[in-house]
Design a protein with these regions (language model features):
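Accessory interdomain/linker segments of ATP-dependent helicases and helicase-like nucleic-acid enzymes
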Residues: 252-254, 259-281
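Secreted, periplasmic, or luminal enzymes acting at the cell surface/secretory milieu
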Residues: 239-245, 249, 275, 279
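Short, glycine-/small-residue-rich phosphate/pyrophosphate-handling segment
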Residues: 1-4
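Hydrophobic helix-and-loop "lid/oligomerization" segment in the mid-to-C-terminal part
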Residues: 11-231, 240-244, 256, 260-263
Length: 281
């Protein structure tokens, strides 16, 4: 959005010597890291941005690539799984200004310590994620029946910055729509949800507004605010919604198989790819 706005302004009032293409590496970084659908113009911008990122002139990004041990030719997976998480970890661990400082540092600042700080945040995030995931698995075994159509878990010992990642892992492991909720000292839970095909989290949220303080997102990923005392009511309402609106057959996990051909091998090299334009497999 910012890139398109800048493009429109420069068309109206050109600035001599200013080339917006110099920022395509940051456009690619932001687009992939934020899981923006890689379709139409987004795909084109990311494709050219990845090429420019290999010779980036942005000191902070270059240092971050060094710390992440990312080398060309770059793919969307390099950004999505190695560079992006280190930037996002700063916000997840309550230090978003560190990511901004690293990306905006000029030639007079040594960017390596800033990049290493982001790498440290990412290691902290990974440790916290592992701890919460292990705890969530234990809670699931204690609180849920295997036939339950949904997973809704909450704790005062969980960090709100990583509940979305844990929700994704739980959803993939059990193939059930999942909300993981971090509860603060006032008893207000901030939850992150991830869903399976056929189950819209927004429809489920709208059907259970009476149990929630707030909720928003889209069909496959959403966030909620819920009082600790209402989590059980929300879990029951969420389960009822899924049972009543989505058949058990539609909730089955499906494996799509295809033939391996020369054309498919060429297709496997297609870049970039992400959630909206799946990586060929």
């Amino acid at each position: 959005m910012v890139f398109k706005l800048a493009h429109a302004l420069l068309k109206a009032r050109p600035v001599e010597g200013f080339d917006l293409k110099d920022f395509l590496d940051l456009v690619a970084l932001a687009t992939v890291a934020d899981i923006v659908p890689l379709v139409k113009e987004n795909r084109l911008l990311v494709r050219h941005g990845l090429k420019r990122m290999e010779q980036t002139q942005h000191n902070g990004l270059r240092a971050l690539m060094e710390v992440a041990q990312v080398k060309g030719p770059l793919t969307s997976a390099d950004v999505g799984f190695r560079i992006g998480p280190r930037i996002n970890a700063a916000g997840r661990m309550d230090r978003p200004e560190d990511a901004l400082e690293a990306l905006m540092c000029n030639a007079n600042v040594d960017p390596l310590p800033l990049a290493e700080r982001l790498d440290s945040h990412n290691r902290d995030r990974q440790a916290e994620e592992q701890r919460i995931h292990k705890d969530a698995l234990k809670c699931y075994e204690e609180e849920h029946h295997p036939d339950d159509p949904v997973i809704v878990l909450g704790s005062r010992d969980w960090h709100p910055g990583v509940v979305g990642i844990v929700a994704s892992r739980m959803m993939r492991r059990f193939h059930k729509p999942t909300f993981i909720i971090a509860i603060d000292e006032k008893g207000i839970g901030k939850g992150s949800g991830r869903s399976i095909g056929g189950v819209s989290l927004m429809d489920a949220i709208n059907a259970n507004r009476e149990h929630l303080e707030a909720g928003g997102g889209h069909a496959m990923a959403a966030g909620i605010s819920v009082h600790e005392d209402k989590i059980a009511d929300f879990r029951n309402g969420f389960a009822d919604f899924v049972t009543e609106n989505v058949s058990a057959e539609d909730r089955l996990q499906r494996l799509h198989l295809d033939a391996l051909t020369a054309g498919l091998l060429n297709h496997l090299d297609s870049e970039p790819a992400n959630l909206a334009l799946d990586e060929p497999a």
